[in-house]
Each structure stands twice: as structure tokens, then as C-alpha cells.
Amino acid sequence: MNEITTWRHVFKLDPNKEITDEQLEQVCESGTDAIIVGGTDGVTLENVIDLLARVRRFSVPCALEVSDIEAITPGFDYYFIPMVLNSRDLTWLIDLHHEAVKQFGDLINWEELFVEGYCILNDECKAASLTSARTNVTEEDVIAYARMAEHMYHFPIFYMEYSGRYGDVALVEKVKRTLERTRLFYGGGIHTPEQAKEMAMWADTVVVGNAIYTNLQMALQTVEAVKGKSA
């Protein structure tokens, strides 16, 4: 956990999206603190292994965010397990997690596994549809989910996921002020350095994903925006 607490900026790579070797090198050598491999659909064991092998040419830490049990493979530094707190489907609250432990319990290195308390806040994103997330939540609802993540479940990470939409900075601030030990991850709609810097004022870790595939050079600038010129 010690290394994860130092992460300020993370790039998320989707195994189901194309990225050239040159582009991948720019991402991995950008100064970002880590790479998370994960996606909502089209994630297979084959494309996860392929992307892992390509990322492993670089020294940047690499985590797999598990969305499909069949795509789990050894070789990552960390394994992030999303638990969607505002899902109406038990699959994303406990069933998948139970099945994963049933299949791989004897093989799991628990020091490498971290559960993320997810709160999906964009009703139009694929993740909300897939997980049957209740996205018409109030500010009080989100803060309650954050408190549950920290004080009831003792999750190391609370993840505010806007997935393609730039989120509510004021709400991110309020959630951050609520949390004491659990780290606040923010992801969604960051396409410019200015947006990244704004969210980094409150989020412990800013996750940049889609921008890699829409405007790579702008995405690369988010590293310095979050971490400063030493990145």
C-alpha cells in the first residue's frame, strides 16, 4: 500500500483499444506514477496479456483493474478489485468477488490486492449500464458512500468515476474533506492539463484514460499539471 499512497497521477489503458508502441512508450515514460490496465467491455485474457507484455518493457508500476475473472493473469504489480457501492446488482457488490476468491483464493497474494469502493456518477457511461449503477444520487449519498468505504469496509481506495464526463469539483472537494485514511481516486472527462490540475487540488490520485486515445499530446501534459515540473 505504501507505493500506492504516493501516486498522484495514473494513466488507465484499455486493452480493447489500439495504441502504437511509440504512443505506449510516451505514456509509460511520461513521469506518470503508474499504469492501470482496465476497461468496461471487450476485455479478454489475450488482450490483457498482450498489453501487459508491452507495458513491462518499462519500469512504471502496473496494476490490473479486474472487470472480468477470465482476464486475470499473473505479472501485474497490483490487482484492483472494484466494488460498485451504488450498484443495484449484487454481482458488482459481492458475487464476482466471491467467485474470484473461490477460483483463485489459494493463489492470491493479498498484499498485492486492493479493493476500490467505486461510485459511478455518469448515467450515460457504459460502466453505469453494465453495473446497473444508481447514478441519480445526491451529494449526501456520495458522501455516505465515501464514509462507508472508509469506516465500514476499510477500503484503501474510494473511486469517484465519471467515465467520460468531467465531474463536479465541489463534490470531489467535499468527499476529500470527508475522508481521512482512504485515498480518493478521481476519473472521468479529463482532457486538458487545466482540468487535471483542478481535480488534483482535491483528489489524491487523478486517473486519465480516454484522452490517451483522443489527444495523446494533451493527455501527456496532464502529468506535469498534476505532479509539477519534476515529473
Curated annotation (Swiss-Prot):
Homodimer. The keyword Lipid metabolism applies. This is Heptaprenylglyceryl phosphate synthase. Keywords: Lipid biosynthesis, Lipid metabolism, Magnesium, Metal-binding, Phospholipid biosynthesis, Phospholipid metabolism, Transferase. HAMAP family: GGGP_HepGP_synthase (MF_00112). It is an enzyme of class 2 (transferase). The gene is pcrB. Its cofactor is Mg(2+). Mg(2+) binds at D14, T40. GO terms for biological process: glycerophospholipid biosynthetic process. The keyword Magnesium applies. Pfam families: PcrB. Pathway: Membrane lipid metabolism; glycerophospholipid metabolism. One of its GO terms (molecular function) is magnesium ion binding.
